[in-house]
Amino acid sequence: MDEINDLAEGLGEPGRAPDEYLDELRTNGFVVVDNVLTSDALERIREATNREIEKQDPAPAEFDDRFGMPHSITWSPDVCRAVTHPVALRIIREYLGTEDIHFCHQPAMTILRPTKELLGTFPDSGWHADYPYHPDVYPEDRWQDENIYGVQYNICIDEFRTDNAATQYVPGSHLVKSFPPRGMNEGGTRMGTPPHENVKQMVAPAGAALIYDSRTWHRACVELNESGEDRLAILNAVCPRWVRPMVDKTNGSTVYFESNAESGLDDLTRVELNHLCHSDTAPLPDGVPTILEKQPMPRRIKI
């Protein structure tokens, strides 16, 4: 894998060679890439996000909630640089087996609130695989394909810990090559107890990136945020560019270009971001599954 030397402002240098992270991702379907963002960049992103939260009317719930702040690439140049980190993207391109990738929704700044009423409860549901491996759009008879059509690229603005609702997942579940069975979403998730006996949490330091195969079974677990504090992360669904976007990205692109946010970016970040977030979907290659159009639906995470 090519060596990457030039890093934009606010980007950290991961502690291992890109090939080592890639090998771990190929082995486990999940890897933590440390030091994607510096502490200064993290603080700027937190401050910018809190300013956006304060503008919301009505104000979002203070507890037991998970929501998104839209258009983060217009109000935080650090988010733009974070989602285009060259080491993370090099790992993803190698894993997907193509240079031509894109984001299937605009980068989603998410805020997971502390729990209160949900503390000690075991909510039903939540277990899923990520786009494009959704049962309403992905053909069931193509789950056994050897090719990989999606990666989740999430950036931890705050540390992911067991006490602040680090994402629950089933290690190795991407190899099952099926959507989570119905029983995973019945009776609540009790880690260590069937059918959730193998469930772990994606623990990682602030500034790290979680990169995992989109077929991985996982869920957000708001009920486990006992920290009393918000936990912030940037979510990205990355696919080969022929995979149709999960949602219509046109409005996000319009808001971005009208904001003139790109004028504050270095050339490499600007070009990469435009390709990932604003390029057209590529023609469908021969032999790949046809991803159906996802029907519009209400979303707590605005993407």
PLM features: residue spans?
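Non-heme Fe(II)-dependent double-stranded beta-helix
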Residues: 1-27, 34-141
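Non-heme Fe(II)/2-oxoglutarate
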Residues: 2-11, 184, 216-303
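Short, solvent-exposed loop/turn segments at secondary-structure junctions
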Residues: 37-39, 109-111, 132, 160-162, ...
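Secondary-structure boundary elements
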Residues: 93-102, 143-147, 157-164
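A structural signal for short, well-ordered beta-strand segments
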Residues: 106-108, 153-155, 234-238
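Short, surface-exposed loop/helix-turn segments at secondary-structure junctions
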Residues: 123-137, 184-198, 225-228, 249-259
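Double-stranded beta-helix
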Residues: 147-150, 158-221
